[in-house]
Amino acid sequence: QCGFINLYGSADGVNCHNTLNDPLDMVLSSVGIPNPSICDIRLMNDRGEEVPPGEVGEIYARGPISPMQYVNAPELDERYRGPGGWVKTGDLGYLNAAGYLVLAGRKKDVIIRGGANISPVQIEGLVMKHPDVMTVACVPVPDEDLGQRVCLCVALKDAGKKFSLQEITEFLREQGLEINKLPEYLRFYRALPLTPAGKVDKKALADDAEGMIMSGQGS
């Protein structure tokens, strides 16, 4: 039997990880605590204020291996560097009751519907509980009235077991998802497209969903 841990890191000098002594549910649901010899972290809101445990914020990091600046790119320093040497990672997360970091997606992926922030990661996690779903991604589609609406992009384990938009929204309601976060469009794929880094290509999915919906082919 072999133990395993979760590790979260980036080129910005972030390093958080579980330990082999952590219970399995903690390993599966979090990325542990910062390695004190590498970095400190803060979770900040859009006003530059540190948020309390349990509340989602952008992950800021600072440590001896954090880059000092971008070379000849002051506009990037303005965007990604904060006072006191803190680096804005663009990742979202929160601290659970044990003080462990739980990731909540990328800040740039947040969907803003009618002024309300919607976390794609939250919806994706609930959809993955459906027995027929293999992979899923939530992407925004533009809307004249609300700014953006939520489109669910799904690859199934068995392509013959498609469900309707109404069926998946009812499933999500049973999982406790708020009404204002329910997806309003549904697209099926044999496999979700990937970036060269092996991550789901949400930009390609968003462009595809927008094109299909504008042409009247979306759900």
Residue positions per predicted region:
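Gly/Ser/Thr-rich phosphate-binding loop
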Residues: 1-26, 39-40
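AMP-binding/adenylate-forming catalytic core of the ANL superfamily
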Residues: 9, 14, 63, 68-69, ...
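Short, P/G- and charge-enriched loop/turn segments at secondary-structure junctions
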Residues: 24-31, 79
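Conserved ATP/PPi-binding loop(s) of AMP-dependent carboxylate-activating enzymes
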Residues: 34-38, 49-80, 118
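Glycine-centered tight turns that cap/initiate beta-strands
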Residues: 37, 132-135, 185, 191
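Generic short beta-strand
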Residues: 40-41, 78, 92, 191
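Hydrophobic alpha-helical segments, especially N-terminal targeting/anchoring helices
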Residues: 44-45, 53, 81, 89, ...
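Acidic/polar alpha-helix N-cap and adjacent early helical turns
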Residues: 207-219
